[in-house]
């Protein structure tokens, strides 16, 4: 049997399991470190060993059990970086890259201080530190396991960020030019909308929040003035249903600030910005 036929068989099964067939080739290529051209060539070769067949089947079994491809290969790409990821942290999403791009585009000043609340793998903090090496970036998370992984990623990227174990602002004592957060924002009532590979594998602490998904936003809104410099800004990622309720929270608690809601590349409400600009 050629490798292409073996792949076809397992891909059909993955589709029946509700998973993306393309994940099989993505994981295989990543683990084998094959270019696309080399992979196409490999597909035409006969599977001559039980070891090779078992290798493909092992990948299939993990995907069929709804394990995300990024966890299988132990890596996710984010803003030009290869970040280590596993079940300790949420897998960085493309939408969050848009949040990073927005921050970099709107803030060209040097020597700014940034606080990333709920840093997880460190994706946002590291992307900002990489592209603004003169900025001072603090990455906070309630999970020590997440901070341990963020520290690994910082070391692997040869970047300096300050890591702090903190439940929102509980262990924060400074004021910052920029506060950014991609907090857990999915309501428990919306659990049925979450894909099985996310629901079964990614940390629920980083996915779900009380108060219809608004709990962390409320805490940030209520306390931000104590940790934000006078001309400081807040950048948030939000769920697509939260384009009205999250801005309302920040207008209530920071009435002197402008609050904007921006859409992502898919046309969904995805970012909220709190700043001193004029509407």
From Swiss-Prot:
Belongs to the protein N5-glutamine methyltransferase family. PrmC subfamily. It catalyses: L-glutaminyl-[peptide chain release factor] + S-adenosyl-L-methionine = N(5)-methyl-L-glutaminyl-[peptide chain release factor] + S-adenosyl-L-homocysteine + H(+). It is an enzyme of class 2 (transferase). SUPFAM superfamilies: S-adenosyl-L-methionine-dependent methyltransferases (SSF53335). Its EC number is 2.1.1.297. It holds the Pfam family PrmC_N. Substrate binds at residues 182-185. Transmembrane segments: none annotated. Methylates the class 1 translation termination release factors RF1/PrfA and RF2/PrfB on the glutamine residue of the universally conserved GGQ motif. It comes from Streptococcus pneumoniae (strain ATCC BAA-255 / R6). GO terms for biological process: methylation; translational termination. S-adenosyl-L-methionine binds at residues 118-122, 141, 182. CDD domains: AdoMet_MTases. InterPro entries: DNA_methylase_N6_adenine_CS, HemK-like, N5-glutamine_MTase, PrmC_N, RF_methyltr_PrmC, SAM-dependent_MTases_sf, Small_mtfrase_dom. This is Release factor glutamine methyltransferase. One of its GO terms (molecular function) is protein-glutamine N-methyltransferase activity. Keywords: Methyltransferase, S-adenosyl-L-methionine, Transferase. PANTHER family: HEMK METHYLTRANSFERASE (PTHR18895), MTRF1L RELEASE FACTOR GLUTAMINE METHYLTRANSFERASE (PTHR18895:SF74). The keyword Membrane does not apply. The gene is prmC. It comes from the Bacteria.
